[in-house]
Regions:
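Non-catalytic, well-ordered alpha-helical scaffold segments
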Residues: 32-35, 102-106, 171-175, 180
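A non-catalytic, helix-rich entry segment at domain boundaries
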Residues: 1-55
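Conserved helix-loop functional segments at active or binding sites
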Residues: 43-44, 87, 114, 163
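Generic alpha-helical structural signal
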Residues: 32-35, 39, 106, 144-155
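Short amphipathic alpha-helical segments and their helix-coil junctions
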Residues: 16-17, 84, 90, 153-161
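Metal-dependent nuclease catalytic regions and adjoining charged, substrate-binding loops involved
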Residues: 111-203
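Short, mixed-charge aromatic SLiMs
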Residues: 1-16, 61-62, 130-136, 201-203
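Mg2+/Mn2+-dependent nuclease catalytic core
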Residues: 57-150
Length: 203
């Protein structure tokens, strides 16, 4: 398995990512971490034991004027139940805080329902850094609520664009943000970007 990984990475590096790492040590550290994640995945399941309906499914759907696109990692049927799965390379949140992590998967479930007419029965997150697996049931009522939430979010984005109002929302993730010097929450000044002419925007 490790030999297959090294062979695949050598080919990708040569053809698509020749300048990804500045030093050999950086590449080696990344390789070691990647091999650990790969081993963790095989401790969760054996991919030879099932045949997914789809992998890396390109989801592009128009929800009555709201265009949504994403890549669904995996969809399969298990004992007559439709399950969609997303892989995460990071660490899993504590279980009591895990529900918000299903936000994107609920959107995928909504798109699958719209595309196929079938409601997924469950959505699953596999955190490879652990590993940890979280799974929850879904139904039409939940997906209807997600549809309303998406439309409300889209309306809020449109209002913010019209008013050019983007208030900061400080939180723990700010520690990793590269734009603190531009953020009012950290004493920065966010200079408005000139809008493109209507003709340019339309093209």
């Amino acid at each position: 398995l490790y030999d297959l990984f090294r062979e695949a990475w050598s080919e990708l590096r040569r053809e698509e990512y020749p300048d990804l790492f500045e030093t050999v040590d950086e590449e080696r550290a990344w390789g070691v971490e990647s091999l650990e994640l790969l081993a963790n995945y095989f401790s969760v399941e054996d991919p030879r034991s099932f045949e997914p309906l789809d992998r890396e499914l390109d989801m592009l759907e128009d929800l009555d004027g709201i265009t949504i696109r994403g890549i669904l990692d995996r969809m399969e049927e298990i004992d007559g139940r439709l399950v969609i799965t997303d892989y995460k390379s990071g660490k899993a949140p504590p279980e009591r805080y895990a529900l918000p992590a299903f936000f994107a998967l609920k959107i995928y479930a909504l798109l699958i329902r719209r595309r196929t007419g079938r409601t997924p029965d469950a959505i699953r997150l596999i955190y490879l850094n652990g590993p940890t697996v979280y799974s929850i049931e879904v139904n039409d009522r939940q997906l209807d609520a997600m549809d309303r939430q998406l439309r409300a979010l889209w309306s809020a984005i449109e209002r913010a664009l019209e008013r050019e109002e983007f208030p900061p929302r400080p939180g723990r993730l700010c520690d990793w943000c590269s734009f603190q010097e531009l953020c009012p929450a950290f004493g920065g000044e966010n200079t408005p970007v000139p809008r493109a002419p209507a003709s340019a925007a339309a093209s």
